[in-house]
Every structure is written in structure tokens, then in C-alpha cells.
A protein has these predicted regions:
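Regulatory loop-to-helix N-cap segments in sensory/regulatory domains
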Residues: 1-6, 126, 134, 139, ...
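Signal-transmission linkers at sensory-effector interfaces
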Residues: 1-33, 39-41, 60-63, 198-212, ...
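Signal-transmission/dimerization alpha-helices at domain junctions
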Residues: 1-4, 108-112, 158-159, 167, ...
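Helix-loop-beta substructure at the N-terminus of cytosolic sensory domains
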Residues: 15, 23-75, 97-102, 224-225, ...
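GAF sensory/regulatory domain recognition
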Residues: 48-97, 120-121, 268, 288, ...
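Regulatory sensory and allosteric helical modules in signal-transduction proteins
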Residues: 70-139, 373, 391-392, 398-399, ...
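A short, aliphatic-rich beta-strand micro-motif
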Residues: 141-152, 157
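Divalent-cation-assisted or electrostatically stabilized phosphate/pyrophosphate-binding catalytic cores
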Residues: 173-177, 213, 283-311, 386-416, ...
């Protein structure tokens, strides 16, 4: 007979278990803890934990343990329960309740079933249990089947325990104390499980909302949508490499699961402010592009100039000018127009740094030709805005457009600061908002220096740069070779743009190789 001290000890175990369950974040480990705790406080040899399926038609095997047979499935066992055992139907083919199966009966009625000997029990079908015993040599005797009801009194699963063990007499019945303790644990476990599932559902909803923002950016511009997806992957690759570092200045850096989740969320949101950036600036593939590429307008103007020149040629001939001479002037003009058009088309691409002589030639073209616009006005061939764009030194963006692009990080910070972050995500804004800062304080928007920034913000900064260098879906360039990207990243380190210690881990742990294998084209991987 159980002593009062034994009962108090088991009650203390129950209290300790309740606290432990509330702290477990991993769903499979939580389920395992529930079953192992139930086995411990009832001294059961075996047990199974079922969860109700989403359609409420089946019980799904989640965790199974039988100590004397050394059977372990699900949880941390390394043996998945999925597919090992068939789901237990709650209803028969005719739609009637499957009350002959004890676990199904408990799930349908919410009643605990305490059976002293399955072989002697009436009203339940234990043929499957007998077959299991015949195959394994086991003897399933006492059964305790308990519903798991959450805080809304909704059944979400079933806890089934087998063969209570007495140190003196072996297999015994589950006592009333066992039953009450198991029912109390099942109630606590169901609430902890519901809370964990609710948190997971909220996390899934939150991440889905983040992905919705990235999808909006993707719909605006396919050139940045891929960026929003790849930067988090590269960030986490680098973070795991840093976490594994055991020497140097990063030896003490560690990541918990909460830290990983917080960093991933920050990386997913690092460019959310781009929803405010005009699409024609984000997608500006050439210097003259706005909603369309204005180089086509310049082509048309050249054709107008050549047409006007042809008209002048025939008028000159009609006025008595020597025909070969008039034709020579016309043809020379057309050749000059064609040559200047080819030049402007090349300049418009913005692929190379603009030379001083090319800038002068562009300005000369702008002033040497005159044409009549649709209003009949005689105007310079190129407008001031077109000259400004065509003489951009490098790339395709003017200073104003670059400022517009850079403003996205300000928008990102404002958007993230407006959210009521829970404690475990309180650093998201700092992580996401710092990826354009530099180690020397010359970055933006806050001109932070290395010591002002977290390691995580610096990780996102490296991931952001390396992804942009190697991206194959940008409008203004093809995907860069891996060796060239690494050389440029080295220059960024030497110029105090990125963190040198993180850069060292990036190289030594060959993070770039894992990223290249997952995201780069084979022709880009040249080292």
C-alpha cells in the first residue's frame, strides 16, 4: 500500500513536471516529456501519446515508449512514429463511434478508462494488443487511458499507460491515486500543449505575414524579392558558423533557439521598407529608365534629325546646290548621328565607370544638336535631366535616386519600431536596421561604428552585401563569379565596411561554398 510520503513525493514530481512542460518550446520534445512524466508518476512500463487529427477523425500516434521491450518511437528517440503505426479511426465505416477501441472511446467521450487486465476486459476490442503480445512475448495487462483536455475543455489527445509496476509484485493495477495524478498531468499537459501549438500558430502566422510583405516587394520587383529570401538563408549560415567557433574573439558567441528565431525574423524583415520605394527606381536597369527606358525617345529624335537633314538636302538641291555636295553633307550628318546614337546607347547601360571624355562627349551631343519638340519649340537635343542621368559616373542611379533607395532602411526602422515586439524579439529592429552601417561609422542611416552594433546586425550586413554581389536576377548585371565576389568582399573588409572577425569566419568556415551550392549557378562557382 502506498504511504503518505510516497504520495507527497509524486505530487511534488507532478508540480515539477508542470513547470518543466511550460518551458519546453520544441513540440516533439514536449510530447515526449508529457509521456515520460506520466510513466514516471504512475510507474508504468509503457505508454502511448496520441493527438487528435485536424479533421477530428483519427488519433495519430506521436510518442511510444515501452521500457521492458526497449521500444521508443517519436520525440528524441531518433525513430519517427509517423508511418510506423496506423492512425486510430474514431469512427467506423458506417459513421458510428468506434467505441470498441479504448483510446478512441476516451477521445470521443472524455472519460478515463482504468482496466485491471486487458485480457479480461469486456466492451473493448484488445485483439490488436493480443497480436502485439504474441509477436513480442510481452503481456499487456493493466491499462490507464486518460483524455487530454485543454483550457477550453476540448479534447486534443489521449494518454494511454500500460502495466503499472510495483517493485515488490511486478505488474499491478493502476490505483485511484495513479488515475488522479495521470488526469491532473494530462490536464496540465493539454494546456501546455495547446499553448505551445498556439504560439507555433502565431509564429507561423507572423512569418507568413513577413513573407507577404516580401511577396509585395517581389510583385513590385522580381529583382529584390529573391534578395529578401536569400539574405536570411545566408545570415543563418554565417550565424551557425560563428556559433560553432571555439577560438578567437567569437569563441564566446552562442545562439539559443530563441536567438536563432529572433535573428531569422530580423533577416526576413531587413528590407521591409522597400515597399515604400518607387518600383522604377528599384528596377532602374539603365540610366534613362523611368517607367520606360527613355533611350528610345533619343533614338526617335535622331531619326527626326536625319529626316530634317534629308529635307534640307533636297531643298538645297532644288535651290541649285551641287547634288553630290548636298548628298555628301547629308550622309556625313547621318553617320555622325548614328555614331552618337551608338555611343549614347552604350553609355545608358551604366556597366562601366564613366570616363571624363565620355562625360564631355555626352554634354557636347546635348548642345550641338537642336530639334523641335511636339510643341514646336526649338530645344537642345538632350534635356538637363537626361544629361544628368547619362553622365552618372557609375551604375544607373542619380544621387537623388540613390537617396531614395537608401531611404528604405529609414522606412524599415520606422516600420519595425512601430511594432510591439515581445521580449524574445526585442532586438529585431536593431538587427534589421543596422545592415547598412559600416565599421568606421561612414554607413547609414545612423553612422554607427563597430562597437555600437550587435554581432547579429553585422552578420546581416555581410549577407546583404554578398547576396547582392552574386545575385543573378539584378537588372543591371549578371551574377558575379564567386572569386570576384570574394575579392570585393575582401576589399569591403579592408575599407572597414564589414566586420573583420565575421569576415574571417565567413572564409575559414567556407560559408560562401554552402551558399554557392544552394543558390548560385554552376558557371558562377569558379573557386
Amino acid at each position: 500500500m502506498e504511504t503518505l510520503d510516497d504520495l507527497f513525493r509524486r505530487l511534488e514530481q507532478l508540480n515539477d513536471i508542470g513547470a518543466s512542460l511550460s518551458n519546453e518550446r520544441n513540440l516533439q520534445l514536449l510530447l515526449e516529456k508529457i509521456l515520460l512524466a506520466a510513466k514516471t508518476i504512475t510507474r508504468a512500463d509503457g505508454g502511448t501519446l496520441y493527438l487528435l487529427s485536424k479533421d477530428k477523425q483519427h488519433l495519430h500516434f506521436e510518442i511510444l515508449r515501452t521500457d521492458s521491450l526497449h521500444l521508443a518511437f517519436g520525440g528524441s528517440s531518433g525513430q519517427p512514429s509517423s508511418g510506423k503505426f496506423p492512425d486510430l479511426p474514431l469512427y467506423k465505416n458506417d459513421g458510428s463511434p468506434n467505441n470498441s477501441m479504448v483510446a478512441a472511446y476516451t477521445a470521443l467521450t472524455g472519460h478515463t478508462v482504468n482496466i485491471a487486465d486487458a485480457y479480461m476486459a469486456e466492451g473493448f476490442d484488445f485483439s490488436g494488443t493480443r497480436q502485439f503480445d504474441e509477436r513480442t512475448g510481452y503481456r499487456s495487462q493493466s491499462f490507464l487511458t486518460v483524455p487530454m483536455k485543454n483550457h477550453e475543455n476540448v479534447i486534443i489527445g489521449v494518454l494511454q499507460l500500460i502495466n503499472a509496476i510495483s517493485p515488490e509484485s511486478g505488474v499491478v493495477d493502476f490505483s485511484q491515486a495513479d488515475q488522479r495524478l495521470a488526469e491532473s498531468l494530462a490536464s496540465q499537459a493539454a494546456i501546455a500543449l495547446s499553448n505551445r501549438q498556439l504560439v507555433q500558430q502565431l509564429e507561423v502566422l507572423f512569418e507568413s505575414f513577413i513573407k507577404l510583405i516580401n511577396l509585395a516587394i517581389d510583385e513590385k520587383s522580381p529583382y529584390t524579392g529573391g534578395h529578401c529570401q536569400r539574405v536570411p538563408e545566408l545570415t543563418m549560415m554565417l550565424a551557425e558558423a560563428v556559433n560553432a567557433t571555439t577560438t578567437g574573439p567569437l569563441a564566446d558567441f552562442t545562439l539559443t533557439e530563441k536567438d536563432r528565431y529572433e535573428l531569422r525574423i530580423a533577416a526576413l524583415l531587413h528590407d521591409c521598407g522597400k515597399v515604400t520605394t518607387p518600383v522604377h527606381v528599384v528596377d532602374k536597369a539603365t540610366k534613362l529608365q523611368t517607367i520606360f527606358d527613355r533611350i528610345d525617345l533619343i533614338d526617335t529624335r535622331f531619326e527626326v534629325l536625319k529626316r530634317d537633314a534629308e529635307v534640307r538636302q533636297w531643298r538645297a538641291i532644288a535651290d541649285g546646290q551641287n547634288q553630290p555636295q548636298a548628298q555628301g553633307i547629308y550622309q556625313a550628318f547621318c553617320r555622325q548621328c548614328d555614331d552618337d546614337r551608338v555611343f549614347l546607347r552604350q553609355v545608358n547601360l551604366g556597366g562601366e565607370r564613366m570616363r571624363d571624355e565620355d562625360i564631355e562627349r555626352t554634354k557636347r551631343i546635348a548642345s550641338q544638336y537642336r530639334w523641335r519638340n511636339v510643341a514646336g519649340e526649338d530645344v537642345p537635343f538632350l534635356s538637363d535631366n537626361e544629361v544628368e542621368n547619362l553622365t552618372i559616373l557609375h551604375g544607373t542611379l542619380t544621387s537623388a535616386e540613390r537617396e531614395t533607395i537608401n531611404h528604405h532602411i529609414v522606412a524599415t526602422i520606422r516600420m519595425l519600431e512601430a511594432l510591439p515586439w515581445p521580449r524574445h524579439l526585442q532586438n529585431v529592429t536593431e538587427y534589421a536596421g543596422g545592415h547598412h552601417e559600416r565599421m568606421d561609422g561612414k554607413g547609414y542611416p545612423k553612422s554607427l561604428k563597430r562597437g555600437d552594433m550587435s554581432w547579429q546586425a553585422r552578420m546581416i550586413g555581410i549577407a546583404d552585401i554578398f547576396e547582392a554581389l552574386t545575385a543573378k536576377d539584378r537588372p543591371y548585371k549578371d551574377g558575379m563569379k564567386l572569386s570576384q565576389a570574394l575579392t570585393i568582399l575582401e576589399n569591403f573588409k579592408n575599407n572597414s565596411h564589414i566586420d573583420p572577425d565575421l569576415h574571417a569566419v565567413f572564409l575559414q568556415s567556407e560559408v560562401y561554398r554552402r551558399y554557392a551550392a544552394a543558390f548560385l549557378e554552376p558557371q558562377q562557382v569558379d573557386c
